[in-house]
Amino acid sequence: MTRWLALLLFGCALAWCGASRAQTCTATPSNLDFGNVNPIAGTAVARTGTINITCNWTLISLQPNALVCLNLSTATTRAMANGASTMQYGLFQDAGNTQTWGSTVSGNTPISVSIAKPLIGTAGNATVNYYGQITAGQTTVPTTGNASTVYSQSFNAETVLAYGYYLLTAPSCASLSSAGSFPFTVSATVTNNCNISATNLSFGTAGLIGAGINATSSLSVTCTNNDAWRISINGGGSGNVAARVMQRTGGGGSVNYQLYTDSARTLAWGDGTGGTTRATGTGTGLAQGVTVYGRVPSQTTPRPGSYGDTVTATIEF
């Protein structure tokens, strides 16, 4: 009887050792996609990712708690890339984007969570958030090929999963050894965008129109860096880009005029029809000034009064 009992206890001891080695934790993060990003807006863009964590216990365990530490190394300021172009961002542990997600190796704080063994079953789960924010003010981030451009950064070896099981007092993250990785990718799609504004063009006051009258105004164009743009100006009230007309306020007269893309006033600015051309350029991510050259040609002087026209500038990109 005694011999049988000794064998039974020895068998249980072997079973306990094997089960102890089966206690493991895993971490599965979601990729973080910032979606479409308009760099010329110059604003920060924030998104949230999740990490699903599962810890397993033996059926009978003297360590009913597990501390899981998610280490992320590399620089505090991170950068997504497309070729040689980059876009800076940060990864954080809090929604306020103040606590950087780091690693014990680099002296920063990893994301950590404690999970308790459930009363029923042997697997405990937890979900934690991580937060990303694209740094504001990166207005010169370019696109390529005049198309939306994906920037990304992948994490693999930079991620270190560490965990430890305990009874009452949790170990420190720094004391735990690496037990694997949790790869994920951060990405954003930089889109082409343009903003345009205009100042009015005034030919001033004239008694007679015996000679041509010149004047200029300007457009301010801000387009995504490396994105080609093209500006058309419609025919205004006449509806004819090749023969623009200012009308007298109250009626009873008109003045012919034209707009040009060049200072010599040889290239009429329109929509590409009727012998007209359009202004073209490439965005820099910063405001670009585009001059509008106007001329009232010599013509029969109309009735005195105030003459004007309204035209619309349209930018394509």
Model-inferred region functions:
Residues 21-81, 124-125, 129, 134-251, ...:
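N-terminal small/polar-rich segments of proteins
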Residues 1-4:
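Positively charged n-region of N-terminal signal peptides that target proteins for export
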Residues 260-262, 267, 272-277:
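Outer membrane beta-barrel transmembrane domains
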